[in-house]
From Swiss-Prot:
First-listed, main subcellular location of the protein, grouped into a coarse class: host cell
Positions of the UniProt region annotated as DNA-binding domain: 352-436
Organism whose genome encodes this protein: Human papillomavirus 22
Subcellular location: Host nucleus
Protein name: Regulatory protein E2
Length: 436
């Protein structure tokens, strides 16, 4: 047991020295995978003999150690084969020789120069997927020699030239069937539109040829392209609904129905207010007409004083916490019974809770939420966890992750927006709910 722990500690020291050295050559990367293989062998031996911990390190299961040891052996063989090629003298980092990089598309190839490509399905900036493509790809031929080629992107997907053939390792058509409806998409590299669908030459989804790629959009499409880029990356006010609507017909129908619903709601609220106003005037006139008859023995005096006091209290409360005229009648929610008076219920029901919707990568939003809660404590009401939209028939996530931040008032929201510093790639938009 003690000798096994000593060997494990010595192995850990060698790994730490290798990480701290930062040497970027192929020999160091081969040595790294040899040490990882020895580590898994020690874990496997310890588990077979009932040892569950080596120092402070818990021992994994036999299946886990065996699988990782096989991965280390396979990576060592690949690197030793690459060492015999003409690319052995190039700099190689731990990331470029990691198992995750080698297994990512195209699999079993070494890659360098990652770039991010965004694809807008149906031309909708909200229905976007991000892909990682590579500038240089090293693939192994049938005679176990290595070739270095450049990676390319076209309308069909990401590919590289293997001999005289196009080899696509990413096809946008696959996700277009899942997330899109029209069978068209736009390819954006470095925030610029590189490829857009051409109606006269672009085949529908499922008919596109593997080796044929449409030409880039003509110069006449540049105004539209610039407006799309501005809409995608610039801050913008939210539409009446904050949901992402993928279907074009459904989006048009909701755009037509939303103003109608608001007009109906406001007309109902105005009619109710007018009816309430007439009822109040009738009751006051009736009381004023009956007060002389009821106040014969001094009864009219106390009645008049009590009515004037109630009027003054009502006027003071309305002036102190009133609601703007354009905010009245903009809600359909029901108010709970936690309020003490009818006036407090009316003020609370007069407007909707304002929110901000943030869109971005899941990890970026999680880190920002942690910083936001510490820095802006007390300046907002609630903040949600990260969530995503899913399709109507599948559970696959659509687009990027989202977070909602609610506020007590619009002024509180505007003040917080002025102080917020959003990370790169995170966008925001306004929103309101009937209730939270």
């Amino acid at each position: 047991m003690e000798k096994l722990s000593e060997r494990f500690s010595a192995l850990q020291e060698k790994l730490m020295d290798l990480y701290e050295s930062g040497v970027e050559d192929l020999e160091t990367q081969i040595q790294h995978w040899k040490l990882l293989r020895q580590e898994q062998v020690l874990f496997y031996y310890a588990r077979r003999h009932g040892i569950l911990r080596l120092g402070y390190q818990p021992v994994p299961t036999l299946a886990t150690s065996e699988s990782k040891a096989k991965d280390a052996i396979a990576m060592g063989l690949l690197l030793e084969s690459l060492q015999k090629s003409q690319y052995a003298e190039e700099p190689w980092t731990l990331v470029e020789t990691s198992l995750e990089t080698v297994k990512s598309p195209p699999a079993d190839c070494f890659k360098k120069g990652p770039k991010s490509v965004e694809v807008y399905f149906d031309g909708d900036p909200e229905n976007v997927m991000s892909y990682t493509v590579w500038s240089y790809i090293y693939y192994q031929t049938d005679d176990e020699s290595w070739e270095k080629v450049e990676g390319h992107v076209d309308y069909t997907g990401a590919y590289y030239i293997e001999g005289t053939f196009k080899t696509y390792y990413i096809k946008f058509e696959t996700d277009a069937k899942r997330y899109g409806t029209t069978g068209h998409w736009e390819v954006h590299v470095n925030k610029d539109t590189v490829f857009t669908p051409v109606t006269s030459s672009t085949p529908p989804v499922g008919v596109a040829s593997q080796n044929s790629a449409p030409e880039p959009a003509s110069t006449s499409d540049s105004p539209q392209r610039s407006s799309q880029v501005t809409h995608r990356y610039g801050r913008k006010a939210s539409s009446p609904t904050i949901t992402t609507i993928r279907r074009q017909k459904r989006r048009e129908r909701q755009r037509q129905e939303t103003p109608t619903r608001r007009r109906k709601t406001r007309s109902r609220s105005r009619s109710t207010e007018q009816r309430g106003g007439r009822a109040t005037r009738r009751s006051l006139s009736r009381e004023s007409a009956e007060s002389p008859r009821r106040g014969g023995r001094g009864g009219g005096g106390p009645l008049t004083r009590s009515r004037s006091r109630s009027r003054s209290r009502t006027r003071e409360s309305v002036d102190g916490g009133g609601v703007a005229p354009d905010e009245v009648g903009a809600t359909l929610r029901s108010i709970g019974r936690q309020h003490s008076g009818r006036l407090a219920q009316l003020l609370d029901a007069a407007k909707d809770p304002p929110v901000i919707l943030l869109r971005g990568a899941a990890n970026t939003l999680k880190c920002y939420r942690y910083r936001f809660r510490k820095k802006h404590a007390g300046s907002f009401q609630f903040i949600s966890t990260t969530w995503s939209w899913v399709g109507g028939h599948t559970t696959d996530r659509i687009g990027r992750s989202r977070i909602l931040i609610s506020f007590h008032t619009d002024r509180e929201r505007e003040k917080c927006l002025q102080q917020m510093k959003l990370p790169l790639g995170v966008e925001w938009s306004y929103g309101q709910f009937d209730d939270l």
